[in-house]
Amino acid sequence: MEVKKLIVHCSDSSFGTSEEIDRWHKERGWNGIGYHFVITNGFFISGKPYNQKQDGIVQKGRSVDKVGAHCRRHNRSSLGICMIGKEHFSDAQRIALMATVLELCGVHELEPGDVYGHYEFDDGKSCPNMSMGVFREDLGFRLKNLRTNRSYTSGGKK
């Protein structure tokens, strides 16, 4: 699968893991988890206490070489990243999201303009409930710095 974009989502739940989302999706009659990555918030199970060690963990979902099931009309050309939560995300989650997107941009030669929120493809969605414009601006700054430093440390070879 040729990856042309990354699409960020939220789980619209206060807790969860990639395994839990896989179960939820199967209960809806789907073929398992539709996202390729899940970023946890420290609440794995409903009603259980927060676990700081489990906050901001990037879990694998659907294999990256398989077409996702997360954004109608864009699944064949994108990877889906789901943040556990709805409107508020922890610092650990935001750091993990940026690190994951930076890595995927490097692997797939993507630019900030190739990273979207689900709401940008579906007027009925607000997911991931964060400003993707601000995220892309920060991503662009970080990508530029990474690429400049990589070029400098590798003798100009990229």
What are these regions (language model features)?
Residues 1-39, 57:
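Cell wall/extracellular polymer interaction/catalysis modules
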Residues 61-69:
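Alpha-helical scaffolding within the catalytic cores
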Residues 68-76:
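Short glycine/proline-enriched loop/turn "hinge" motifs that connect secondary-structure elements
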